Amino acid sequence: MANVPITSLPQASTVAKTDQLILQGSSTQRATLAKVLSDLSIVNPDMAQDTMLRIMVPNGAGAHNATFRGKNLGGSLTSAQAAQISAGTFQDLYLGDYWSIGGVNYLIAGFDYWLNTGDTPCTKHHVAVIPQNHLYTAAMNETNTTEGGYAGSQMYKTGLDQAKQTLTNAFGAAHILNRRECLANSVSNGKPSGGGWFDSTIELPSENMMYGSHLFAPASDGGTIPQNYTVCKAQLPLFRLAPQYSFTRASWCWLRDVVSVTAFADVGSDGSAGYNYASYVGGVRPVGGIC
């Protein structure tokens, strides 16, 4: 083949990955097409999904909040995973991925969901996690009242203690995101009328986080404009891409929104949006950040 122009050779009608190619650098060598595709990270149908995602999805929260995978990440948060979260790169972590710890699947529901929020800004990169099913059942209050709002409820004061301990045991205290959250702490005529800033780790989610909008929580009616005491104004990205994860068939679950003088919002076990009297016992399916 010496001194034969490559353009004078016949053109191949088909190409296989086992075909041999001539490579010329410091020396003349040969390589299969499959080797070239692999070494140059060229996306092709035979590429493993994880490899393809690493090539196609850029590092950072924006792209990862738009990519669903649903992979089991193992039985613990590894040092490599923690490093990716801390750096805000989130490589090999995607929506719907989950850690299976102590019989609970903790789903990744969003990346940097609370970043820069709060009266004191949240500056740590993090993933928002939520258990696939409720952890246990409890009432919002002993009686049918929403007095004091979510921050004044029995659920907020003591009912989440078990959830906080469960997530701390699963991920370690050093990896639980501590941030600032605005919460309703007073109610007038069945509508939130006051709020304040609180240190926050593990909370009940809100209607906004589940659905992307208020459904039963009070909203502007042309006469009154209720204040939304929250920084959680956007839907968790997981539920936008895979809404089947927004509810659990095992139980209806509490949300933190005040609906009336007697009821808080909930997510139905059939996927519906609803509300229930504060003394009713429903599922506790909390959300928190891992950093």
Place the predicted regions along the sequence by residue.
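Short, solvent-exposed coil/turn linker segments
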Residues: N3-Q11, T32-L33, V43, T78, ...
